[in-house]
Amino acid sequence: MSNKYNNLLKEVAAKYASIILNDAKIKSLTSINSAEYLYDSFVEISKLPLEKKLPLKWKLITVKENICTKTNLTTAASNMLKDYNSPFDASIVESLKKAGGIILGKTNMDEFAMGVKSENNLFGRTVNPVVKDSNYDVGGSSGGAAAAIAADICYASVGSDTGGSIRLPAAYVGCVGFKPSFGRISRYGMLAFANSFDTVGIAANNVKGVTKVFNVLDHPDINDSTCLTKEARYFVKEQHKKLSRKPIKIGIPIDWNVSETHPNVLDKWNEFISLLKSNGYLVQEIQLPISLYANSVYSTMAYAEATSNLAKYNTIAFGNCLDEKFEEEIISSTARSFFLGDEVKKRLLLGAYSLARMNSSDLFSKARYVRRAIQLEFNKNFFLPSFSVDDPRGDIDFIVTPSFFNSSQPIETPSSYSHLSDTMLVPANMAGIPSVSIPFGTLNNGLPMGIQIMAQYLNDEDLLSFAGQFA
């Protein structure tokens, strides 16, 4: 073995040992590829021609447990899929590998991405690595992804964001979490929760790292019909060039200054607004009153979509099996009760209730109407057009809010409180617009403060460029 590869082997072994040690307490990883696999990947990449562009060369990347990989089980953190081995890599995993990235392993999550605490019956709970005694909530559902970044386990982590899933944990641990516009990144190979809300999410230590991964994943994919075509991307890019302008205007939604927000969070929000003004940005108050109903609409629509998406996990088409020999209907019902966790079962029941014939017109149909109203409300404030709505526009480039009402809470905090934790983040999923959570110092309790920045639909590049000035 040459000295070059001998030194590389030592580096991989040292890094591998460090990863195992760092993750022992926080439990951000559900599986990790072997040291031999990592070494072989490093060697394979090092043999490629120097002129070959590899933006993620030798970067260790983790992916969420609901993203398909051939080298690891893909369980969605559920006993229903605890032995599922995907025969293919998700499109995003293929893209990461082609860019020189090395898949380190999979990260923990709430079962089927339903929850805000990153806990499940299969792998247990991920804890917040920024708290020394490790008894604080890391957020969810992509808590393992953010925790892996905060613990310096990987360069970047790719998860999902259905209602704040990557941004809330990122805010809780003090890293950057990004949800792109709906349709920018392929979801082929990502297990669905709610199709009209699901996006791929990216976490990294800074906006530069997030941007690098986003540029690798941001491309058309014929395997995902909701992924924007090459022609659509070109059209949007050209239109945005024609409409670009200065000075940049920042909108502050006064409706979001609600009583539930902790006073210290409000202080940090105002501090960030002052920073924007001192940097020469124009700041003005805007109104987004309908967006305050986003959480209620999300609960109705997302749970209904989940009811449909998870119907296939009946132990007959997909899913773990019971030993008992019953009729098919009994097998399916019994297995779902046995293998699915309480939070998933609760959401599926609520989704089924909103889709029932006697309720759908009052619940699901009205929720769709309110969702559209939220999209229009955002659109009328932004300067750039959304290309899906032909309505009067405003003059705002970016909207700035806190990422949460309050910081990470002790693990024993009641779940009824935790379910409000992503209220600030859900509206971006509702409207399909890009949103990034960036760290902004710490609160009086020593925990990280997160600031959310949102932009018009498909204006992802400008959003990341703007956010990169602060993180």
Swiss-Prot record:
Pfam families associated with the record: Amidase
Subcellular location: Mitochondrion
Molecular function in Gene Ontology: ATP binding; glutaminyl-tRNA synthase (glutamine-hydrolyzing) activity
GO CC field: cytoplasm; glutamyl-tRNA(Gln) amidotransferase complex; mitochondrial matrix; mitochondrion
Catalytic residues, chain numbering: K64 (charge relay system), S141 (charge relay system), S165 (acyl-ester intermediate)
Record keywords: ATP-binding, Ligase, Mitochondrion, Nucleotide-binding, Protein biosynthesis
Main location (coarse class): mitochondrion
Role: Allows the formation of correctly charged Gln-tRNA(Gln) through the transamidation of misacylated Glu-tRNA(Gln) in the mitochondria. The reaction takes place in the presence of glutamine and ATP through an activated gamma-phospho-Glu-tRNA(Gln).
PANTHER family: GLUTAMYL-TRNA(GLN) AMIDOTRANSFERASE SUBUNIT A, MITOCHONDRIAL (PTHR11895:SF7), TRANSAMIDASE (PTHR11895)
Family (UniProt): Belongs to the amidase family. GatA subfamily.
Name of this chain's protein: Glutamyl-tRNA(Gln) amidotransferase subunit A, mitochondrial
Organism per entry: Schizosaccharomyces pombe (strain 972 / ATCC 24843) (Fission yeast)
Source taxonomy: Eukaryota, Fungi, Dikarya, Ascomycota, Taphrinomycotina
